[in-house]
């Protein structure tokens, strides 16, 4: 077991039993160590400037490995909403598969992202990232400051917005597709909706 995995296990404050977390992390480490030719599901070249982004991106990969196949996402109550989201000049976000139960619970848990983001490509969907989302009014009932995850602050999106939703907080994590502008920036210039 690598030092990185041991450190993640030791520092983990998640509610997952350590034995299960050890197995998940060991499997992810094996996949990552195999290199970019081992799978077409993961882009290996992510670049992070500190340990915090790398840790959160790595955790997201571990927790969402099971959702690289979109059928697993739908089986876990994630459903596509809003179609493929694209920006005029910032790239795209992709197709958001949202778990409405997780969205409505008012909680933030790195192991349970509210949305899985897929990029359409040649009639298939490729997992590229996740989005943590919490309704602002629900969050404010029990919290006095905006949400944070592994030291990363969420962005506030007011209402009205392009989605027709009440105000919410959100955090994108581009764990499966490198984003030249940063792992937590909303728009990813490497993601496109053209492959639908």
Residue ranges of each PLM-predicted region?
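N-terminal secretory signal peptides that target proteins for export/translocation
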Residues: 1-16
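Bacterial Sec-dependent N-terminal signal peptides
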Residues: 30-46
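Residues at secondary-structure transition points
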Residues: 29, 33, 97-100
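Primary mode marks residue(s) on the alpha4-beta5-alpha5 output face of response regulator receiver
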Residues: 41-196
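Bacterial N-terminal signal peptides
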Residues: 20-31
């Amino acid at each position: 077991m690598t030092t990185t995995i041991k450190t993640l296990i030791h520092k983990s404050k998640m509610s997952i039993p350590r034995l299960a977390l050890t197995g998940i992390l060991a499997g992810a480490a094996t996949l990552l160590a195999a290199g970019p030719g081992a799978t077409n599901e993961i882009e290996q070249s992510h670049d992070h400037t500190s340990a915090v982004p790398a840790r959160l991106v790595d955790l997201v990969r571990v927790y969402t490995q099971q959702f690289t196949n979109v059928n697993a996402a739908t089986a876990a109550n994630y459903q596509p909403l809003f179609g493929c989201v694209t920006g005029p000049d910032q790239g795209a976000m992709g197709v958001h598969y949202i778990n409405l139960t997780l969205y409505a619970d008012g909680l933030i848990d790195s192991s349970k992202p509210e949305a899985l983001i897929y990029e359409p490509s040649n009639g298939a969907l490729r997992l590229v990232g996740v989005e943590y989302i919490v309704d602002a009014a629900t969050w404010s009932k029990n919290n006095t400051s905006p949400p944070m995850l592994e030291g990363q602050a969420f962005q506030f999106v007011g209402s009205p917005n392009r989605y027709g939703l009440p105000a919410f907080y959100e955090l994108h994590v581009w764990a499966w597709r490198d984003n030249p502008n940063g792992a937590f920036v909303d728009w990813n210039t490497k993601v496109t909706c053209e492959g639908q």
